[in-house]
Amino acid sequence: MAETQNLLLFRKWDLSDIEVVDPGLKTAISLRKMTLPYTYGRSALKRFNKADANIVERLANKMMHFGKKYAKNTGRMAGKKMGSINTVKTAFEIINLKTGRNPVEVLVRAVENSAPNEDTTRIVYGGTVYHVSVDVSPLRRVDLALRFIADGVKEAAFRKPKSLEEFLAEHLILAANNTTDAPSVKKKNELERIAQASR
């Protein structure tokens, strides 16, 4: 039991004092203690098990994929999970150097600020398609936030001299401060604006 209490993420960052502020995301963001965020896909076996996967591992998983753009996906981060984890680890060190804060806390704030509350869905009624505003479940909110962060970082870093780690660190800091300069926060606001117009 004493060993579990002393587990530090990447042997550096303590997860015990981090709190999820958004009450809707408390069940969806897992801050389970582990040294290396790698569960070998155990969370994929059951339907809602991904809620138990550490939020850092879920970010690393999202960083392995580049949306639906085939040309940008081919040959890059294709299942190279340790490469993705090392990218996140280096970005965390940059965040700590720039802000002096625990980078996992910065990630949690970034996810909270990038998670949309409303989305739209299509309803076909009498042969006509209507877009209707719907509330988003906590698990999908976290999924969308992580996707917005990963896609925004990859898009910004594509064919740029600056490294992916630096872009990820900058993006997480901006999103944690809830500034619209962060592409994930901008995307969230756009999604909620469209949903508000579809009410």
Curated annotation (Swiss-Prot):
CDD domains from the UniProt entry = uS7_Eukaryote
Q: Which Gene3D superfamilies match?
A: Ribosomal protein S7 domain (1.10.455.10)
Name the keywords, alphabetized. Ribonucleoprotein, Ribosomal protein, RNA-binding, rRNA-binding
Q: Name one Pfam family in it.
A: Ribosomal_S7
State if Magnesium is listed as a keyword: no
Q: Which GO terms describe its molecular function?
A: rRNA binding; structural constituent of ribosome
UniProt cross-references to InterPro entries, sorted A to Z: Ribosomal_uS7, Ribosomal_uS7_arc, Ribosomal_uS7_dom, Ribosomal_uS7_dom_sf, Ribosomal_uS7_euk/arc
The positions making up the signal sequence are: none
Q: Tell me a GO cellular component.
A: small ribosomal subunit
Q: Which GO terms describe its biological process?
A: translation
Entry keyword annotation includes Chaperone: no
Summarizing the function annotation, the protein's role is: One of the primary rRNA binding proteins, it binds directly to 16S rRNA where it nucleates assembly of the head domain of the 30S subunit. Is located at the subunit interface close to the decoding center.
| HAMAP family recorded | Ribosomal_uS7_A
Quaternary data: Part of the 30S ribosomal subunit.
Q: Which family does it belong to?
A: Belongs to the universal ribosomal protein uS7 family.
Name assigned to this protein: Small ribosomal subunit protein uS7
Q: Which organism is it from?
A: Cenarchaeum symbiosum (strain A)
State which gene encodes it: rps7
